[in-house]
């Protein structure tokens, strides 16, 4: 299978075999994957985001399940975004934190936080055994133009504050893509996942980028409900991006 990549050639697509669904335990999933060996992959990636694809490591994929279309690509049109009351409270609650964008280069501190998060969120699932190699393969990859958005406690005596969260973010000419966010489990009350997205939106606004891609939203899935709380949300129907009105409860 191939898709039109430019005026000269096509980019090959591969379909994976069926595998366990990462969202519904009673379903099977499969994906479309852009040719990972194509040297143009980095150049075509911005367009692939607009086609509903997503990056994991060096793979750019999109769900393509035989009997399920639950995974809906979503993005935020940042110029039209306005935080709701809950999101404003989140910003206020975390105004003491220090946010900075750094190179996508693993540090021991980031790796320790990543492993702590996986043990909390995915105990016994295999991911909780990830080390430095898996960190680099999953989050950084070999060709992506990524950055790490770090969220820290305030500095103490000119030393950096404790690292609370990292939002792995891909940067393209016109958009940011939220790849993965991990945070200190004991700081869950701060809603750092939501706070990270709000910071990515502000980052995109500062740099005049049009969208922040949030990956996939699944209607009725508890872990995906938070995405519906964001205004200016758009969903991809396979051909076009359409407005998806925010829902205060996220359902």
UniProtKB/Swiss-Prot annotation:
InterPro entries according to UniProt: Acyl_CoA_acyltransferase (IPR016181), Asp_Glu_LeuTrfase (IPR017138), N-end_Aminoacyl_Trfase (IPR030700), N-end_Aminoacyl_Trfase_C (IPR007472), N-end_Aminoacyl_Trfase_N (IPR007471)
- Keywords on record: Acyltransferase, Cytoplasm, Transferase
Q: Name one GO biological process term.
A: ubiquitin-dependent protein catabolic process via the N-end rule pathway
Q: Which reaction does it catalyse?
A: N-terminal L-glutamyl-[protein] + L-leucyl-tRNA(Leu) = N-terminal L-leucyl-L-glutamyl-[protein] + tRNA(Leu) + H(+); N-terminal L-aspartyl-[protein] + L-leucyl-tRNA(Leu) = N-terminal L-leucyl-L-aspartyl-[protein] + tRNA(Leu) + H(+)
Q: Name one GO molecular function term.
A: arginyl-tRNA--protein transferase activity
Whether Cytoplasm counts among this entry's keywords is: yes
What is one cellular component GO term in this UniProt entry? cytoplasm
The protein's matches in Pfam families, at most eight in alphabetical order, are given as: ATE_C, ATE_N
Domain of life from the UniProt record: Bacteria
Intracellular or extracellular location(s): Cytoplasm
Q: Which cysteines are joined by disulfide bonds?
A: none
E.C. number(s) listed in UniProt: 2.3.2.29
Name the enzyme group at the top EC level. transferase
**Record family assignment:** Belongs to the R-transferase family. Bpt subfamily.
State the protein's purpose: Functions in the N-end rule pathway of protein degradation where it conjugates Leu from its aminoacyl-tRNA to the N-termini of proteins containing an N-terminal aspartate or glutamate.
Instruction: Write down what this protein is called.
Output: Aspartate/glutamate leucyltransferase
Organism, by scientific name, is Xanthomonas oryzae pv. oryzae (strain PXO99A)
